Amino acid sequence: MAKERACRHCHYITTEDRCPVCGSRDLSDDWFDLVIVLDVESRIAKKLRESIPEAAKVPGKYAIRVR
């Protein structure tokens, strides 16, 4: 099973070597807590974008904190 890593730029969680959302290769194994965004127009997605501007632009799993 592939290890999930979080993008340091947009916080998207992926098993790939490149972030499918922003294209960054700067991924981390050291991330905490996650939010699953189904609707990018939801209040939670908008709140997430307030603290992480690049986050929650597409549905998926996002890390709250990435080191």
From Swiss-Prot:
One GO CC term on file: chromosome
Amino acids binding Zn(2+): C7, C10, C19, C22
SMART domains found in the cross-reference section: Spt4 (SM01389)
Predominant localisation class: cytoplasm
Subcellular localization(s) per the UniProt record: Chromosome
Phenotype caused by lack of the gene: Essential, it cannot be deleted.
Entry-linked InterPro entries: RPABC4/Spt4, Spt4/RpoE2_Znf, Spt4_arch, Spt4_dom_sf
Annotated GO MF terms: zinc ion binding
Any one of the GO BP annotations: regulation of DNA-templated transcription
Pfam families linked: Spt4
PANTHER family associated with the record: TRANSCRIPTION ELONGATION FACTOR SPT4
Function noted in UniProt: The Stp4-Spt5 complex stimulates transcription elongation on both naked DNA and histone-bound DNA (chromatin), facilitating transcription through the histone barrier. Neither protein functions alone. The complex also stimulates the transcription termination activity of FttA, neither protein alone stimulates FttA-dependent termination.
NCBIfam families hit by this protein: PRK08351.1, RNAP_arch_Epp
Family the UniProt entry places it in: Belongs to the archaeal Spt4 family.
Assembly, per entry: Heterodimer composed of Spt4 and Spt5. Interacts with RNA polymerase (RNAP). The complex interacts with FttA.
Protein name: Transcription elongation factor Spt4
Species whose genome carries this gene: Thermococcus kodakarensis (strain ATCC BAA-918 / JCM 12380 / KOD1)
Gene behind this protein: spt4
